[in-house]
Regions:
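Active-site mouth of glycoside hydrolases
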Residues: 2-191
Length: 191
């Protein structure tokens, strides 16, 4: 039987090449056979730096003054974000494909977190139409990898602008867009 033994490294894939290589080497020598990580960058006390890339064309809020002490003052409505949620940044997704492929070589499942509430760029508050486009695009790019699992959200109940019905609809979009029927999950926070 297969027993998933996983870890979470939310944005390891959006770090420097050196840190990505170090993470892969650590995983190679670990008991883990699954890792959870995000498509979107994460803004949190240990993730206050800017990521290597963004999923959309546009410009982010100026993060040069963000520290671990003031990171909570920045949210999805922060001034300065200017994204085109209909124009994906292919290099961002190509890089994630590279990371998924490297995990596959190690025999590690890539449990991809599609949404999360720790956001200063506005990705957690996109319109339903933009969310649908994002899900279809992500499924089209990543579903061909045999080691992909879908995690609809990390702490879905902390994303206040999405209802249970929204999550059900997002699940249906992935089901319809992923011809390989990869495993699917959603993670709660407070509920």
């Amino acid at each position: 039987p297969y027993y998933p033994v996983g870890t979470t490294c939310y944005v390891w894939n959006l770090q420097s090449d050196d840190l990505i290589a170090q993470t892969l080497e650590t995983l190679r020598n670990s008991p883990f056979n699954k890792i959870r990580f995000c498509v979107f960058p994460k803004s949190y006390c240990y993730n206050s730096r800017e990521p290597r890339s963004y999923p959309y064309e546009g410009t982010p809020v100026d993060g040069s003054a963000i520290t671990e002490d003031n990171v909570w003052g920045y949210g999805p409505d922060s001034k300065g974000n200017n994204w085109d949620f209909e124009r994906f940044n292919p290099k961002h997704f190509q890089h994630i494909e590279y990371c998924i492929g490297e995990l596959q070589k190690l025999g590690i499942e890539a449990d991809i977190i599609l949404f999360h509430p720790y956001d200063r760029w506005g990705f957690s508050t996109m319109t339903p139409e933009c969310n649908e486009l994002y899900l279809k695009y992500t499924a089209a790019r990543f579903s061909a990898f045999r080691n992909v699992w879908w995690s609809f959200a990390n702490e879905y109940d902390l994303i206040k602008n999405k209802s249970i019905e929204d999550w059900e609809r997002y699940a249906q979009i992935i089901v319809e867009s992923d011809p390989y029927d990869h495993l699917r999950s959603i993670h709660n926070g407070n509920q």
